[in-house]
From Swiss-Prot:
Disulphide bridges, residue numbers: 41-64, 55-96, 78-112
Sugar-modified residues: 50
Subcellular location: Cell membrane
Membrane topology: Multi-pass membrane protein
One GO BP annotation of this record: regulation of protein metabolic process
Superkingdom to which the source organism belongs: Eukaryota
Gene3D superfamilies tied to this protein: GPCR, family 2, extracellular hormone receptor domain, Rhodopsin 7-helix transmembrane proteins
Similarity comment: Belongs to the G-protein coupled receptor 2 family.
Protein name as catalogued: Growth hormone-releasing hormone receptor
The gene coding this protein: GHRHR
């Protein structure tokens, strides 16, 4: 196999990895290193005095061969990136003949072997992960859309807490849609060079992906903040708090994503904006996410503390305790699901722990929207009751509007009445 084809084959085998990891392209590090080596080699060759004797310095696509005299053998080690596949360091020789450089001996595939069977298994693994997260996001979109329809269509379910849930559902739909858009824009062809590919659509898809991810984290945090406010206050202003959450939950992601896009356009408009591993501007996106994860985890611990105190028998009647529990149980199932997960990985480098991170964040994580829809809608007793009433002809929408508002959405002064079974 020709040395150029051998190098290209290795990179093609690695190409499924960026499809799964999104913004991490390890093969681009290899290509970038080769391009730098080629540039240095050609520059050194130009600086060497011209001579008709021997063989000039040359770049063969993988290694830079220095100037050599006629009849001289030159031995060079395999390119550095081959060390990722084998601990044994190979070497390649070339003879400077009267007609020029000879072919490398032994050939690159022999001197610099790559375990293609292992790479084929990894390719199959990454393809399987992609299938799993595609199925997971698809199921989540359907479930979330149904959940939003239910919460919007049934007026007796209208209350600030369910409004917050609806916003969270929407962010999961956006996040899943952004994944599909990014896959379509960046990985529509196996021949795409991810290291130099640059179109308006691919940049928009990457920016949309970052925005959707930030909104998802911000509304996960909003869920924790809102529940903290309800549990900690005896007379919470639910609707006013909701509109503050709307402003922060959507406004901050717009601000940070817009700032990141501006920095990319002005200072780092290269490739498809997804080579963020060493970019300082990546922290405009990652920094707020890491901070929100830490705050969310702290709020989770505070919620547990409040619930333990409020659920003590001495604190109130069994009826009040039941109301607190019914209010918080779905959120308590959700916050640990995300908090523990992200508290482990978000403070680590992006390429750390990929063996565990891939199946959790991409595989299991793609079903998170589906899980949220189940916890906050389909298993919610009040939602099931309202659906049952409409199904059996007892339409709650036929009740007078003033009765519906007074019973279901208007908070009273009493903490026990504020934390109703519905909101």
């Amino acid at each position: 196999m020709d040395r150029r084809m051998w190098g290209a084959h290795v990179f093609c085998v690695l190409s499924p990895l960026p499809t799964v990891l999104g913004h991490m392209h390890p093969e681009c590090d290899f290509i970038t290193q080769l391009r730098e080596d080629e540039s240095a080699c050609l520059q050194a060759a130009e600086e060497m005095p011209n001579t008709t004797l021997g063989c000039p310095a040359t770049w063969d696509g993988l290694l830079c061969w220095p100037t050599a005299g006629s009849g001289e053998w030159v031995t060079l080690p395999c390119p550095d990136f081959f060390s990722h596949f084998s601990s044994e360091s190979g070497a390649v020789k070339r003879d400077c003949t009267i007609t020029g450089w000879s072919e490398p001996f032994p050939p690159y595939p022999v001197a610099c072997p790559v375990p293609l069977e292992l790479l084929a298994e990894e390719e199959s693994y990454f393809s399987t992960v992609k299938i799993i997260y595609t199925v997971g996001h698809s199921i989540s979109i359907v479930a979330l859309f149904v959940a939003i329809t239910i919460l919007v269509a049934l007026r007796r379910l209208h209350c600030p807490r369910n409004y917050v849930h609806t916003q969270l559902f929407t962010t999961f739909i956006l996040k899943a849609g952004a994944v599909f858009l990014k896959d379509a824009a960046l990985f529509h062809s196996d021949d795409t060079d991810h290291c130099s590919f640059s179109t308006v659509l691919c940049k928009v898809s990457v920016a949309a992906s970052h925005f959707a991810t930030m909104t998802n984290f911000s509304w996960l945090l909003a869920e924790a903040v809102y529940l903290n406010c309800l549990l900690a206050s005896t007379s919470p202003s639910s609707r006013r708090a909701f509109w503050w959450l709307v402003l922060a939950g959507w406004g901050l992601p717009v601000l940070f994503t817009g700032t990141w896009v501006s920095c990319k356009l002005a200072f780092e408009d290269i490739a498809c904006w997804d080579l963020d591993d060493t970019s300082p501007y990546w922290w405009i996106i990652k920094g707020p996410i890491v901070l929100s994860v830490g705050v969310n985890f702290g709020l989770f611990l505070n919620i547990i503390r409040i619930l333990v105190r409020k659920l003590e028998p001495a604190q109130g009647s069994l009826h009040t305790q039941s109301q607190y529990w019914r209010l918080s149980k779905s959120t308590l199932f959700l916050i640990p699901l995300f908090g523990i997960h992200y508290i482990i990985f978000n403070f680590l480098p992006d390429n750390a722990g990929l063996g565990i991170r891939l199946p959790l964040e991409l595989g299991l994580g793609s079903f998170q929207g589906f899980i949220v829809a189940i916890l906050y809608c389909f298993l919610n007793q009040e939602v099931r009751t309202e659906i049952s009433r409409k199904w059996h002809g007892h339409d709650p929408e036929l009740l007078p509007a003033w009765r519906t508002r007074a019973k279901w959405t208007t908070p009273s002064r009493s903490a026990a009445k504020v934390l109703t079974s519905m909101c």
